[in-house]
Amino acid sequence: MSDSFYRYDVIVIGGGHAGTEAALASARTGARTLLLTHNIETVGAMSCNPAIGGIGKGHLVKEIDGLGGAMARAADLAGIQWRTLNASKGPAVRATRCQADRNLYRTAIRCIVEAQPNLTVFQAAVDDLIIHNGTSEADSVRGVITQTGLRFQAPSVVLTAGTFLAGKIHVGETQYAAGRMGDPPATTLAARLRERPFAIDRLKTGTPPRIDGRTLDYGVMAEQPGDDPLPVMSFMGQVSDHPRQVSCWITQTTEQTHEIIRNALHRSPLYSGQIEGIGPRYCPSIEDKVVRFAEKTSHQIFVEPEGLEVAEIYPNGISTSLPFDVQLALVRSIHGFANAHITRPGYAIEYDFFDPRGLKASLETKAVGGLFFAGQINGTTGYEEAAAQGLLAGLNAARHVQGLPAWSPRRDEAYLGVLVDDLITHGTTEPYRMFTSRAEYRLQLREDNADARLTGVGRAMGLVDDARWARFAAKQEAVQRETTRLSALWATPGNALGREVAGALGVTVSRETNVLDLIKRPELTYATLMRVPTLGPGVDDAQVAEQVEISVKYAGYLDRQRDDIARQQRHETTPIPEGFDYASVRGLSIEVQQKLERVRPQHIGQAQRIPGMTPAAISLLLVHLERARRSQVA
């Protein structure tokens, strides 16, 4: 093989949701990229629940899409049941979710990966990193060594190992090494990384048993059909992209279920001390739910199809690591599951993760230059959180090679910015999940405007191709054109438009009113106004109509939030030099110095969000930084 086969700009380790987005982002910027995976057949595999999106998560998927990523496009091609969550609430918290066909999703991701220029895929497990130990400068990564001894060289490496680092599966008293069920763990790589100056701990996650859907009684369950009209996930998508649609179903556990679980808790690795890692707070096992909510007589279970051409279903809500005989008993005690056949047991998996406070906002490690971490190894849970980190890490890995400054969005620019800032500032002791409640400026960070927030930035950095840019530009132009058209129309009590509005909508126009002001009325929407003959039919693009309505209806709130952001940003981006000596700042307490030394914030905004940081300490820091700046100028 030629020397060029072993040399790349960026190497990505792992072909999951973080790894594929990292490799694609790197390659889109022009960096020669190698994606290493232990099994090409599992690139893009959905290891746990067959779904994309949800509260907070759908926002991340839209942001990935706005930056040219793959997840939303694959979801549109694989989504077999679609819902808009919080549809009756404000636009800030509305979220798109789809039930996905596992095989269709994996196929879509693999096709996107294989079609991407500058991206090479190679099947190999990685056992070690090649790291140059600096003397006068920091250590830096130079490449990787595979299980078979192949050495691939690159000045940037992105590690996206998911649950594979020293992964250990638990089913009752049985435990064994695995990355996930059916896949070997990355044991050697985990051991090598533990020799490096990284803070490493253990987390755990779990998955429910899978069931043969043909053995269930759907007659005692509640059907949950998808939405009509169907939403789409990608700004490039259309409803015709979706495959055939199916329903999900809802059932409940019973008192018998809970009794079976309580009687077997002594055999649960969660309660015997066998599992040391902390699990996700917002996706607890059925054992946890029965113990923590002892007063509840039932827990809801969503019966979700795994795909169109397979019989398996995913019983969302009964993640468990109890012994198999207990799993079988508890499953058959659920309404409609009396004759259920389990096709795969549920299990818990423990794995290594790195304290994310050891990362820069670019997701580059502070300890080793050119080495980036993304996904579950940073303490997060969920496909969407992993994919968003992967895109950011892949982009910055490429920019590192290209000699360009790293990029990371602020908290007021993207949920991705909230995610990264939370991780690198606060760290985490349990798997981190994104919610809209984590964002201070969520009215700005809506699903519908993710492209308006990020596509221009993505285009400037090489992430957005010509087709997406043309679609985005056309959409923005249409929004502006329609807003301008409506702003030129006025209704008065006596003119024709005023009479039409009153007649068609039953709305009284008591004074001269601009049509845009009519949209601001709580009882009116863009769609209802378009029923007025002089105003309609309006635009036929639902995304354009939505943008027009939201930008007008919430204009006052948005303006106030922008003012809040401007005030907050006054010192947010003031940089703190790398290697800054906090002991040199007179007046800082030892406690504050230790907090700052531990996190090593890159700017004042990050320093402000360190738990226990006081306004007085920030003021002292700002004064010191300003003095240092003036002395350099002088």
Swiss-Prot record:
NAD(+) binds at residues 279-293. It is found in: Cytoplasm. Pfam families: GIDA, GIDA_C_1st, SAM_GIDA_C. GO terms for cellular component: cytosol. One of its GO terms (biological process) is tRNA methylation. One of its GO terms (molecular function) is flavin adenine dinucleotide binding. InterPro entries: FAD/NAD-bd_sf, GIDA_C_N, MnmG, MnmG-rel, MnmG-rel_CS, MnmG_C, MnmG_C_subdom, MnmG_C_subdom_sf. Keywords: Cytoplasm, FAD, Flavoprotein, NAD, tRNA processing. FAD binds at residues 14-19. Its cofactor is FAD. NAD-binding protein involved in the addition of a carboxymethylaminomethyl (cmnm) group at the wobble position (U34) of certain tRNAs, forming tRNA-cmnm(5)s(2)U34. Belongs to the MnmG family. Homodimer. Heterotetramer of two MnmE and two MnmG subunits. NCBIfam families: mnmG_gidA (TIGR00136). This is tRNA uridine 5-carboxymethylaminomethyl modification enzyme MnmG. It comes from Xanthomonas euvesicatoria pv. vesicatoria (strain 85-10). The gene is mnmG.
